[in-house]
Amino acid sequence: MDYHSPYFFGYLLGMIHLLGIVAALHALFTVRTAQGAIAWAMPLLFIPYLTLIPYLIFGARSFYAYIKARRQANQEMHVAMANLNWRPWVEEALTARESESYAALRAMPKLGRMPCLANNQVKLLINGKATFDAIFAAIEKARDVVLVQFFIIHDDTLGKALQQLLLRKAAEGVQVFVLYDRVGSHALPASYSQMLRDGGVQIHAFATRRGWFNRFQVNFRNHRKIVVVDGLLGFIGGHNVGDEYLGEHPQLSPWRDTHVQISGPVLACLQESFAEDWYWATRQLPPLILPDTYPDNGVLCQALASGPADPQETCSLFFLEAIHSATRRVWITSPYFIPDEAVFAALRLAVLRGVDVRVLIPSRPDHRIVYAASSLFAFEAVRAGVRMFRYQPGFLHQKVVLVDDDVSAIGSANLDNRSFRLNFEITLLTVDRGFADQVEHMLHEDFEHAREITAEDTQDTHRLQQLGMRIARLISPIL
């Protein structure tokens, strides 16, 4: 072929556009939502030379193959668990169903793959110092097994402190298992993991890649944050392991986040969620520990694990059910506000029902494109009657939902398409008036440090900013 021919580049561009048409048709048939299909198809048709390779990396080509593989691994894991006679929650599940509070969860117990359980104890952990002080203190007392899972682990001061603590516990004979997301922790040096392995800690990266093509598939990420110590004490929430979560990032400080400390039968569900991810990464089961007895009182809890391999879109349906169930209020905090059409419609309908709908988002960006898309959605929400607030002191990263007077949810799930359909997430649902009062008090303080977005703000935005927001929203389904 004559590469210097005047026709060569014409043929090449024609071939690229033809491939773009094929890829656009593929997106229309395989992407799960209309918004996502359009967000891929239009750029593939008009600028394929810029979007073909990103579509191969982030698109839907291997989605269904991955779903099949993940479900098969989960099935194998549960067969292995059945041999352990792992049925720890029968009595607590029956007690939960007999409780008057159970009705407040409505569809949640059937939506999640794990039951609502009674007799749990929960403690709110506000911001990084309280969270990591509690986690480190729990690990310090470990005698048998420590399970640690984070989306991001940094090799900084906090990361090194965790590393040294885990090495010390492993040297004492404690079995330590660490799981991190390969994409989220892309900056973690191999030496960090190797030092842990050399010290007896079992550490693995969670990756969705299987086979030659799937090595390019980086769009599914494990966003869960789980710590379980000896089957007795657990932690989930929004924090990852890094100095910025302690407020050490100058541009984002002070960092605002929330975790929750848990004890009781629901820890079996946290262990099962960890076991699924560990089994996918290693094809082995970690040790699972159950206490001999549980307290006879406590609060109703349900661990809601969600991910792209679920039979239905668990995370987005959770937000829909939470909003639809609200009769008095629904308050949501999320670092990103990119609702799909169904969730946005649910928010508007809640306003029309007279529900106090509030959403708290950051005033500072950590991802500028996502921030721009969130801003446009926020302006549209304000016009629909939703009260939108921007947290002023620093970056807001917490993921909290408060419904009426009893139901609260704290976990890793953001109010965006990535959490709805691409990430593995975990959230703790709690039905308890006393704990909900604590969450309400915490959120009241956050709102006091926030500025409400007004209709005037939506009008004062420069036209170039509006254009940028609309472009960001166009690609928001694939962010």
UniProtKB/Swiss-Prot annotation:
Entry annotated with the keyword Phosphoprotein: no
Gene3D superfamilies named in the record: Endonuclease Chain A
Domain PLD phosphodiesterase: 218-245, 392-419
Superkingdom of the source species: Bacteria
Catalytic site positions: H223, K225, D230, H397, K399, D404
Membrane topology: Multi-pass membrane protein
Entries under PROSITE patterns matching the protein: PLD
Alphabetized UniProt keyword annotations: Cell inner membrane, Cell membrane, Lipid biosynthesis, Lipid metabolism, Membrane, Phospholipid biosynthesis, Phospholipid metabolism, Repeat, Transferase, Transmembrane, Transmembrane helix
GO cellular component: plasma membrane
Protein name: Cardiolipin synthase A
